[in-house]
């Protein structure tokens, strides 16, 4: 699998029936996503931007993707920076949905 095929997928409905990834599975998928890190069973990325307005604009664009996929990241909007944290709340860890959303966000940013 590559990032293009990952970003072409759609997120599955979130529920406790989703399979939480093992650390090895998460580490494998992470190799497809440059600029993302694993932290406490969550995907994180910090995106440097020009100013607060650009961070807010990017947050809104990510929000539109999140609504379309019905999978929502935690966003931290700061002057010159947008922090993104993704995980599946229902399993309190990572699932394929998180990596699909991250790939779609990468397409938007990169």
Specify the residue positions occupied by each region the protein language model found.
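Long, contiguous binding/interaction regions
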Residues: 1-110
């Amino acid at each position: 699998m590559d990032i293009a095929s990952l970003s072409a997928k759609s997120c599955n409905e979130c529920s406790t029936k989703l399979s939480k990834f093992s650390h090895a599975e998460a580490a494998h998928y992470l190799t497809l996503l440059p600029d993302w890190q694993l932290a406490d069973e969550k995907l994180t990325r910090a995106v440097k931007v020009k100013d607060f307005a650009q961070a807010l604009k990017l947050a809104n664009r990510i929000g539109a993707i999140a609504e379309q996929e019905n999978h929502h990241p935690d966003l931290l909007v700061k002057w010159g920076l947008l922090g993104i944290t993704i995980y599946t709340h229902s399993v309190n860890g990572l699932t394929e949905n998180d990596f699909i959303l991250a790939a779609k966000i990468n397409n938007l940013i990169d």
